[in-house]
Amino acid sequence: MEINKNDNNNNINNNNINNNNNNNNNNNNNNNNNNNNNNNNNNNNNNNNNQNNNQKNNYRNYKPIKTGTLIQHQILQQTLSNFQTKNKVFQLGSDKLILIFKENETIYFHGTIQARSIIGSVEVYGYTITPQSTTYYPIYSPFCSPTLSITSNNSNNKLYTLKEIIENQLIKIPELVKNKLKENEKQIEIDEPTLAISSIIVLKILDDHCENPKMFTKKKIEIIDSFKLLKGFYPLYQPDFNTQLLTIPNEWLNLINTQFLYNDHCNNNGLSILTCGERNVGKSTFNRILINKLLKKYTHIIFIETDTGQTEFTPSGIMSIDIINSPLLGPPFTHCKNNPLKSYFFGDTSPKNNPEYFLNLSFQLIDCCNLIKQQYPNIPIILNTNGWLKSLGLHLTQEIIKYFKPTSIVQLINNNNNNNNNNNNNNNNNNNNNNNNNNLNDNLNNFINRFDSTVTFSQDCINQLFEDCDDDNDDNKNLKTTIITKLYSINSINNFSQSIYKPIFNLGSSEIRNLMFKSYFKLESKGSLSHQSPYQVSWKELKVKILTNNVPPSQTMYALNASLVGICIDEDPEKNYKYISYKVGNNLPTIINQSPLISQCIGLGLIRSIDMVNGYYYIITPIDPSLLEISNTILKGSIEIPQTLTISVSSKGKILVPYLQLDVLSSYGTGSDVMNRPSFFDD
């Protein structure tokens, strides 16, 4: 395939195709989804405002603080971190600090940092950092996520005296650290003669470039004197801004420790866990903690992603399988991957528009996992599902469970039944004199609960699923196997949260997806998409498929222009598409007019423009050119590139949005040469 890097963006002909017709087939779906998200966000904001008003008397100098379009509130007067800095923090070189922890000490913080343990161990996001590893672990605690913490791991730590650490030859610590402790030994003993040390760590500035840096900084924030050396690290003691702490429920830890980490009584096939639950119950948080805990016992973990709306390692719309060998110490956009082990482009945030294709891709990922298990039978597996557990969504989840055959299912549940019961009791008391009204209210509540109540699995339900599988395999006894799957139902993280607050940058689902796209396309290091040089790709060997709606072949190129696409490799193109493809003309790529067979996705790309005369796509993508050269299929779904990724600023400071301008001839009455469409970026 002919691929050239086009360094002159001005040579790209953006007028070959009328961009105003771009992707009309997907606008209705996106608008509906956005409206639903906005309604949900409005409801959540109303609930939060009511809670904040109820707590008004408890605030310290209660004053709303306007941040952009959000109204934040000051937090309760309490100290978050209990780590004592006096004679416990010492500078080591130009970019490191030594921290001495006592028992039960914690530092809550925002920002970025690298941490290494010297004595004892500390916990971060469920992961235990031990002295056995000389690695500095990068930790990301953005202002848009719950606040992370570094906590001394008291359950496993022996307590030391400072003299013992310095003089005991059996305690191996770096010489530079030992010398620094010797220098400050007298000062520490004078201040606290009976100091019992639980752990000693070294913090280091995170020099690596971080995508989405605005999420890790705040214009006005109090910096503790002891930590001023560490640029970008903000410990929280009594912050004057809104924050939400990440608290890991003991119920979660007990389940992981007793059933997964220290329990060897799983099936002979090894540990395989499927996590499920409705939206906003904390599945992603639980999966990260589960991975971090399992890495204490296993060196590698297989992770299967089937939630296309809130992905962990890739941008939205991609279903993937990957092998994890390092802890996840931050939100998804801090560990976004360009090259997972294997991925498939689904092209939508929900399976409702193409459920059959969704199941086919899910089964393909599970088949890939089974091939890995044949070679490494003891490697644990985690499969993440989406939050759609009603009607068709419930059926899809059941089909995945039957095909995956996990040893364990973890179900996260929101327990809101108490509130519903209280409301029902109040209604009954108010209507005791009117039996007809009581009956009407009861019937109405029962009808609503049938559709609005949380859908949950039971152990009997799971057993019945596999009994049905055995019945289907009665004709083939070789396929009939005994499947033991245990169901664990635990409370969602919302039931344990002691804070009524949200992160200072309280982002919605679409905004979180935008952060993943920014990380994937590396906009901070490479600049906005409008400034990146595209690849010039010949379409002679490329097949094209629009996954959503029916787009006439004559309109396919209009739909592709300025759109986000999945770039794929069809390993057997002649066999797969011999009878379901055709060409509109000799100078156009092959159009797939039926459901595509499964082809591996090597990454995403933005088709910036199309040269209809010479037959080229101009594609912006982080994919390696050697992989791009062997690609032969382009798939387009309903996911569009966020506008925030393409904007640029003119020399006069005006925000420019590509593809949102109307060029007109300058004549009497037109007013100006260019009329900009209104957008939310305009002041």
Curated annotation (Swiss-Prot):
EC number, as in UniProt: 2.7.1.-
Residues that, per the record, bind ATP: G277, E278, R279, N280, V281, G282, K283, S284
ATP-binding as UniProt keyword: yes
Function recorded in the entry: Polynucleotide 5'-kinase involved in rRNA processing.
Key words, A-Z: ATP-binding, Coiled coil, Kinase, Nucleotide-binding, Nucleus, rRNA processing, Transferase
GO BP, one annotated term: cleavage in ITS2 between 5.8S rRNA and LSU-rRNA of tricistronic rRNA transcript (SSU-rRNA, 5.8S rRNA, LSU-rRNA)
Source domain of life: Eukaryota
Family: Belongs to the Clp1 family. NOL9/GRC3 subfamily.
Compartment(s): Nucleus, Nucleolus
One GO CC annotation: nucleolus
Primary gene name: nol9
Organism phylogeny: Eukaryota, Amoebozoa, Evosea, Eumycetozoa, Dictyostelia
Naturally occurring in which organism (per UniProt): Dictyostelium discoideum
Name of the protein this chain belongs to: Polynucleotide 5'-hydroxyl-kinase nol9
Coiled coil: 420-454
UniProt GO MF annotations: ATP binding; ATP-dependent polydeoxyribonucleotide 5'-hydroxyl-kinase activity; polynucleotide 5'-hydroxyl-kinase activity
Record's compositionally biased regions (Low complexity): 1-58
InterPro entries per UniProt: Clp1/Grc3, CLP1_P, P-loop_NTPase
Keyword Kinase found: yes
